[in-house]
Structures are given as C-alpha cells and as structure tokens.
C-alpha cells in the first residue's frame, strides 16, 4: 500500500500590490472593476473578494473573454471607456478590442505587448492609476494651452482690426504664445503623486 508523502499545489500568485492598485483605480475615478479569468469559479471568487473587485467572470476561454468584453462595451455609456489589463498571449485579442489595452510588459507575451495601447514595463499594476493621473494632467495642460492661444490670438485679431495693436503684437500672438504654451507643457514632465 502506498502512503502519501506530500502534496504539490500549483497556483497563480496574486501580485503583491494588486489590492492597492484596484483601490488606486477607484480613487482615480474608475467606476467598476471586472475580473475576467479562466480560473475555476471558486478560486476566482476568492481572489476577486480579496482584491475588492466589483464583478468576477470565471472559467472563460480566450474567445469567451472577447465575448465578455463585447458585452461590457455594449453596456457602457457613450463617454465611458473600457480598459483591459492583461499579460498573456490569450489576452491579445481582448487587449486589441478594448478601448484601452494595457499590457504588463516585463512578463507579458509579445502578442499582448503588440496588441496593447499602453505597456507597463515593470509589471506593477499600481502604475495604471499613476498613468491615468499623468494623462489627466496632460489633457488639462493641452486644454489650457488651446484656450490661452485662442484667447490671445482672437484678442490681437480684434484689436488689430480696429487699429489698436501693431505688427509686434501679432508676432507675440504667434511666436510668443507658442513659446508660452511649450513652457506650460513642460509641467507635464514634473509629475508628482
């Protein structure tokens, strides 16, 4: 008769800061976090509960993940965006289908990296919230530059039409505003969390 000498357990390990990453996403304005996984329902539900995921969809084949993303895309609002984070070769179709595909690059497959819109090279999921904050700051700066340039140019145009400003003001409205916009844009380089 044989006697057991031990067990071998094979499992995926949850990234150490995954829970903090999900909290960071929610703090950054993400309304709903859905986990799509091929894992068994019991395991997926336990991991989802541990991480604070809003919804778990488990036992999915790669094609099923695409179908689930299609359902999520159909259910979202017109101005809402759907982001998908993945690292495996099986995630490539979903990464390319999502509005924003984010690949975890250091351990990610080449197919996932190629299909993604954003690649995080250090596999730290907390960087997703940081990337969102940087993009929001960058968009604010772009909007500021556009409004500033239009206000100055239209003011010089209107004042020039009635004869209050000369050619030097027009040069300032063109070159000076461009230089100020570039200097304003450099603020995006000094991002601090």
Model-derived segments and spans:
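Cytosolic catalytic headpiece
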Residues: 1-100, 133-136
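Membrane-embedded alpha-helical bundles of multi-pass transporters
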Residues: 29-30, 51, 55, 74-75, ...
């Amino acid at each position: 008769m044989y006697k057991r000498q031990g067990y071998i357990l094979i499992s995926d390990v949850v990234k150490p800061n995954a829970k903090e990453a999900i909290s960071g996403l929610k703090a950054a304005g993400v309304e709903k976090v859905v986990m799509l996984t091929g894992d068994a329902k019991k395991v997926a539900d336990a991991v989802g509960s541990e991480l604070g995921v809003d919804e778990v969809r488990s036992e999915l084949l790669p094609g099923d993940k695409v179908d689930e993303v299609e359902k999520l895309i159909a259910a979202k609002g017109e101005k809402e965006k759907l982001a998908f984070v993945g690292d495996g070769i099986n995630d490539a179709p979903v990464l390319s289908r999502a509005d924003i595909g984010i690949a975890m690059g250091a351990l990610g497959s080449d197919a996932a990296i190629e299909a993604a819109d954003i690649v995080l090279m250090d596999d730290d999921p907390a960087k997703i919230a940081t990337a969102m904050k940087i993009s929001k700051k960058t968009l604010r700066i772009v909007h500021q530059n556009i409004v500033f340039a239009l206000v100055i140019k239209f003011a010089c145009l209107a004042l020039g039409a009635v004869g209050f400003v000369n050619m030097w003001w027009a040069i300032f409205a063109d070159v000076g505003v461009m230089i100020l916009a570039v200097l304003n844009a450099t603020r995006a380089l000094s991002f601090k969390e």
